[in-house]
Amino acid sequence: MVWEVKTNQMPNAVQKLLLVMDKRASGMNDSLELLQCNENLPSSPGYNSCDEHMELDDLPELQAVQSDPTQSGMYQLSSDVSHQEYPRSSWNQNTSDIPETTYRENEVDWLTELANIATSPQSPLMQCSFYNRSSPVHIIATSKSLHSYARPPPVSSSSKSEPAFPHHHWKEETPVRHERANSESESGIFCMSSLSDDDDLGWCNSWPSTVWHCFLKGTRLCFHKGSNKEWQDVEDFARAEGCDNEEDLQMGIHKGYGSDGLKLLSHEESVSFGESVLKLTFDPGTVEDGLLTVECKLDHPFYVKNKGWSSFYPSLTVVQHGIPCCEVHIGDVCLPPGHPDAINFDDSGVFDTFKSYDFTPMDSSAVYVLSSMARQRRASLSCGGPGGQDFARSGFSKNCGSPGSSQLSSNSLYAKAVKNHSSGTVSATSPNKCKRPMNAFMLFAKKYRVEYTQMYPGKDNRAISVILGDRWKKMKNEERRMYTLEAKALAEEQKRLNPDCWKRKRTNSGSQQH
């Protein structure tokens, strides 16, 4: 039975209170005993009642309402009558400062009330800070599969009509392409708009998905063996590879091609369709399959066996895809998605590579910023909490020095700062804050300096720089473009991370003239 309380003060503010009606052959007295109130008010219904009439002086007129027999019995009270659906403990009343009048009509349930209690400022849960959302360290330690191929999402219903790609025992492919999220994320480096702490999902919405083997969309393939030796897009090849058509006999030799990985034999930089690309030659490991030559973008990431994510231009890759990478070398074996060595590989390999280098403030690239983030992560893990970030910052202070200590206690550091036209204010948390990134020629010289030093063993570093400068002047604009793009990407990233870098430098240079 349902009772409705009508009052003239607040006719619209009616709250419903569920009563569990005893369906057994018992009186109303037994069923009303299930109602528990924390306050003993005169207006509360008493136990001495019958099914037809209740004589209470302060209780408004009660009218019987016809209800659906399939629904549960409800007892409706005016909002000025204190009541609760379930008994709450005393700490709930103290910690929740949200009044009951703020709840909307008919939308309050037990879970909502618990959520309001848990998220209140006085809640013990909200007083515990597990991590800082603005810290990049949280992003690195989010998922165990940080440097593994992401699992593709379930294929949507709209893609069922398209020909599906073959799924081998090591392959996990999907026609769905993961677009890179907005770079204006709170991470500062990793370009993601949302994060998931679920180890099964990881960062699958941010990592690029491969179309075939380890190659991304936009890659062109050319097989050295087979009837079709022409250049073809990886999308067209994957679509034809997925069609189980007996007429396409030329595709038969490519079934399971490079299942154990593709070994890099050679690489060169060329121009294709007016764009600078990488021309790579791979060996699948079997003589009958033949070699494979591909043309891919400069920032194309590869997952290398026993190394992790790698790229020919790590700075471009981390800006474009948000993937910290090592450098690719001849002999590296690029693994496909789902390969056992790619799944079980230790995720910290890339950061271990960063740890082997001693970066200086001159290395103002995105890779250096990532290495700093990795050191913060290791420091936070060793300290066992958010205090590790302070430990990492203190480590930076020891290496780079604070504004006061660098000028008072170390004249050599101050002289070096003046020589390099630095601003004189070195941040403890960002060692490369006052350093401009390398330009196109510096990137070119950094890549070929070791090679030219080996070619001319009798020449010193200055002579090698002169030779590199002559080589740079003789290069065509198409050949320089790849370095220009990388330098531009580094400059934009540096300006985004440290917008006052150039401004402070001009201010400091002006003060030095006086």
Swiss-Prot record:
**Protein location:** Nucleus
Q: Can the keyword Transcription be found in this entry's annotation?
A: yes
Fetch the InterPro entries from UniProt: Ataxin_AXH_dom, Ataxin_AXH_dom_sf, HBP1, HMG_box_dom, HMG_box_dom_sf
| Residue ranges of every copy of the AXH domain listed in the record | 203-345
Does Transcription show up as a keyword for this record? yes
PTM annotation: Ubiquitinated by the CTLH E3 ubiquitin-protein ligase complex, leading to subsequent proteasomal degradation.
| CDD domains hit by this protein | HMG-box_HBP1
Q: What is this protein called?
A: HMG box-containing protein 1
Secretion signal span:
none
Q: Which Pfam families match?
A: AXH, HMG_box
| Biological process annotations from GO | regulation of cell cycle; regulation of transcription by RNA polymerase II; Wnt signaling pathway
For this chain, one GO molecular function annotation is:
RNA binding
Q: Which SMART domains match?
A: AXH, HMG
One Gene Ontology cellular component: nucleoplasm
- Assembly information from the UniProt record: Binds the second PAH repeat of SIN3A. Binds TCF4. Binds RB1.
Feature: DNA-binding region: 434-502
Instruction: Tell me the keywords, alphabetical order.
Output: DNA-binding, Nucleus, Repressor, Transcription, Transcription regulation, Ubl conjugation, Wnt signaling pathway
> Locations of Basic and acidic residues compositional bias?
170-182
PANTHER family recorded: HMG BOX-CONTAINING PROTEIN 1
Query: Region annotation Disordered: residue ranges?
Result: 150-182
Tell me the superkingdom of the source: Eukaryota
Summary of the function given for this chain in its UniProt record:
Transcriptional repressor that binds to the promoter region of target genes. Plays a role in the regulation of the cell cycle and of the Wnt pathway. Binds preferentially to the sequence 5'-TTCATTCATTCA-3'. Binding to the histone H1.0 promoter is enhanced by interaction with RB1. Disrupts the interaction between DNA and TCF4.
Residue ranges the record marks as coiled coil? none
